[in-house]
Every structure is written in structure tokens, then in C-alpha cells.
Regions:
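Carbohydrate-associated surface elements
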Residues: 81, 100-103
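Short hydrophobic beta-strand element within catalytic cores of glycosyltransferases
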Residues: 225-229, 235-240
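A charged, aromatic-enriched C-terminal amphipathic alpha-helix characteristic of glycosyltransferases
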Residues: 275-301
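Active-site proximal beta-strand in glycosyltransferases
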Residues: 15, 31-50
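Acidic donor-binding loop of glycosyltransferase active sites
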Residues: 73, 207-221, 234
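Membrane-proximal helix-turn-helix segments that form the acceptor-binding/catalytic region
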Residues: 5, 32, 56-78
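Conserved catalytic-core segment of nucleotide-activated headgroup transferases in glycan assembly
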Residues: 104-185, 195, 199-200, 260
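Active-site donor-binding acidic/aromatic loop of nucleotide-activated sugar
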Residues: 190-199, 205, 257
Length: 301
């Protein structure tokens, strides 16, 4: 507190933004003692995320989250559903709540030549046939919703795909913190599963893969990996829960949404979606960081 108070006074800072509600107590104290504006940037309704994960203390967090947002001078939410929930349940002033979505650094899709070059690099790196369809899933595997999604891929989706002898494919799994009990997924090597682990450049995989699969059904909030995948003009098949916060009106035919737990339809779409479709320019108007930053600035003017 004292270090931050000194910095605020010396630098004549007027606004303080906190990410998530956890440091709400500190933000509120600094607002009171330094006469600054407090802005809370919510990535999702955190208490509800932990409720879906069946944490007993989610209700305590809910009340703390409510207090933090009510004490803020302005609140940024990453999607309209969260904003509407907070206005109704936390009793917030709508004029002090703005949807500022997660963003993407590119203002347009990569050139086809760049995507082809990335694909060739991935095929060479992982010994994949040029004619195979490359499916991608990535995420921190120490996070339960992602680990649950991996289990779905291994036990629900992949067996259905394997049964179709005419569909040639590989599933690449990227992400660290895979539990030791999974043994690096070596038991699945002969079942078209490639565990790449943590990769230095995930953008290479976004550019070079054919389809991003997102069978996540827990965890809440917008899935940043889906935003990034679409931004690289990568076709996406997602559960309904996994597509929260991404308007289907701006994704064209690049994202197919399936009801949670409907793995039959999910796998059918994997085999029928056309990766050659292009993400519409309206997608970048919505998710490009430059446009998002301008909206945030105007909200605080």
C-alpha cells in the first residue's frame, strides 16, 4: 500500500486499474487515500467460475466481488453477459459499466502464404503427412477445465474419429503442466495424438493448423485461445460454453458451435467443416486491440 501510494503521488496518477477483483481491498484503500479513480477490469465473474468448479467458498468470493465492483468508479467487463449479470446482481450503475473484450494483436488475417509456410513447418516438426488434417488444442493442462477437455478429446472425440478409416488426421496438444499420471500421452502416440507440450511460439500452430477444437464445458468467461485461433483464420469447433463472449454474427463460417456434451455432432463437424473459409473483416473490427483501447479510453473520458 505505502509503496503504491508513494508512486501514485510522485507520478500524479489519476486512475488505477486492477485486474480481477482480488486486489479490490487495496484498490479501494488507494482510491480513498490518494483521491484517484478506481477501475476494475473483470475477466469473468470469478465467483461463478469457481461455482462451476464446485468450490465451497464461491459464495464468499461472490460478496467480495460485489463490494469491489460497487466501490469502483468504472467497471470493464470482457463480455456483455458478464456486464449484464453484474448490473443486475451486483446492483451496478449501467453508465459505469463498459464491455471491453479481450483483444487480438493483428488487424487482419495472416496471408495464405504465411499459413502454408507454418503448416509445412509443423508437418516437418511432427512428421505429419501433408494430406492429414491438423487439429489443435492448447491450454494450461494444470487447469481443471482444460484437463477435462483433454480427457474428452482422448476418450470421446478421438475414438469416433479413429473409427472413420477414410479421415486422415493428427491432433496436436499444446500446453504445460500435464499431470505426471498422463505419462506425456505416450500411450496415445499410435492413436493420432501428438503431445507437443509447452511450445515457444503458439502462433505458429494457430497459423499452420486446420481446425482448432475447443471441447471446454467449465471455467466460465471468454476463451482467449478461441479469439486468437479465429484471428489467425483458423477454423474453430467449440462447445456452447467454450464460445461464450464471441458473437457468432462476426465469425462467418469459421466457428461452429455445438451443444455441450454432444460429441457425436462435434466430431461430425470436424470432418465436414471447410478450413478454406475466411474470417470476416468485422471480426477484427470487434477484437483488434487498437479499436478496443480506443473504446476503453472514451469510456473513461
Amino acid at each position: 500500500f505505502f509503496t503504491l501510494r508513494l508512486i501514485i503521488r510522485e507520478e500524479k496518477i489519476t486512475h488505477l486499474i486492477i485486474e480481477h477483483p482480488y486486489y479490490g481491498w487495496l484498490g479501494i484503500l488507494l482510491k480513498w487515500f490518494c483521491n484517484i479513480k478506481l477501475v476494475v477490469h473483470s475477466h469473468n465473474i470469478e465467483s461463478l467460475r469457481f461455482k462451476t468448479m464446485k468450490k465451497w467458498w464461491w459464495g464468499i468470493l461472490w460478496h467480495y466481488e460485489k463490494i469491489t465492483h460497487r466501490k469502483a468508479d468504472h467497471n470493464f467487463f470482457i463480455q456483455d453477459n458478464d456486464r449484464n449479470y453484474a448490473i443486475e446482481n451486483f446492483k451496478l450503475d449501467p453508465e459505469k459499466c463498459t464491455t471491453i473484450t479481450y483483444g487480438f494483436e493483428l488487424s487482419e488475417a495472416p496471408a495464405p502464404a504465411d499459413k502454408q509456410m507454418a503448416r509445412e513447418q509443423i508437418c516437418k516438426l511432427h512428421n505429419i503427412a501433408a494430406t492429414d488434417t491438423i487439429l489443435l488444442f492448447n491450454g494450461t493442462l494444470g487447469y481443471k477445465p482444460n484437463l477435462d477437455a483433454l480427457d474428452v478429446i482422448l476418450e470421446k472425440i478421438n475414438p469416433i474419429l479413429l473409427a472413420d478409416k477414410n479421415f486422415r488426421y493428427k491432433i496436436i496438444i499444446c500446453g504445460n503442466k500435464l499431470p505426471a499420471a498422463c505419462n506425456g500421452l505416450v500411450d496415445y502416440k499410435e492413436r493420432n495424438i501428438i503431445y507437443a507440450g509447452f511450445v515457444d511460439d503458439i502462433n505458429l500452430y494457430f497459423k499452420g493448423s486446420d481446425i482448432f477444437i475447443n471441447p471446454v464445458i467449465d471455467g466460465g468467461g471468454i476463451k482467449t485461445k478461441v479469439v486468437e485461433a479465429l484471428g489467425y483464420n483458423l477454423s474453430v469447433i467449440s462447445t456452447q460454453s467454450g464460445a461464450i463472449g464471441i458473437p457468432d454474427t462476426i465469425t462467418g463460417n469459421k466457428m461452429k458451435i455445438v451443444a455441450d456434451n454432444d460429441w457425436g455432432t462435434f466430431t461430425t463437424l470436424i470432418k465436414t467443416i471447410d478450413p478454406a473459409d475466411t474470417i470476416p473483416p468485422t471480426y477484427f473490427s470487434h477484437f483488434y486491440w487498437g479499436n478496443i483501447a480506443e473504446k476503453a479510453k472514451n469510456a473513461l473520458m
